[in-house]
Amino acid sequence: MIHKGDNTMAQKCISKQFIENEMEFWKIPSVAIAVVKDDEIVMSEAFGYKDVENKIPATPKTQYGIASCSKSFTSTIIAMLVDEGKLDYDVPIIEYFPDFKMYDEFATKECTLRDMLSHRTGLAPHDALWIDTIDRSTLWERLRYLKPMAPFRAQTLYNNTIYTLIGHIAEKITGQT
């Protein structure tokens, strides 16, 4: 547990008893909480076990899978880049990145951030690709080989792989990971 400075408000709002009650009610094995004030972490604490079977406690540094919550972060970063004029939702990706290539010429020339963010690329989920098996730049190169499940923009097909590539676009624009 880390507590810095005056954090009595954080402690009042986030009581240990409340957290433990919620964990028990929802059958949550562990949770980590951080409170940030003025760009500084004023409280960081973990509860429960990261490994219940072996009774290994969670710590503030325990990493948790956040699954599709990352899509909110990714789309927010893209919105910020659009707001800054560094990207446009409706400009084809290939205009920013000439090495962008999809399964056919039409999709390659027309695909925009709007298409990617709204799951309208026509690509099947290909979920096995996004689970830490390959890095983003390799996935970028392999995009051209992924087969569609529907014609481009014909229907919405939920796609984790495309969101991984949207994150890669943000990395390429900002130079940050």
Identify the meaning behind each predicted range.
Residues 41-47:
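Amphipathic coiled-coil signal-relay and dimerization helices
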Residues 6-38:
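Beta-lactamase-like hydrolase cores
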Residues 30-32, 44, 63:
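A common structural microfeature
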Residues 25, 51-160, 168, 172-177:
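Active-site-proximal loop and beta-strand segments within enzyme catalytic domains
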Residues 40-41, 86:
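Residue-level signal for well-ordered, solvent-exposed loop/turn and beta-edge residues enriched
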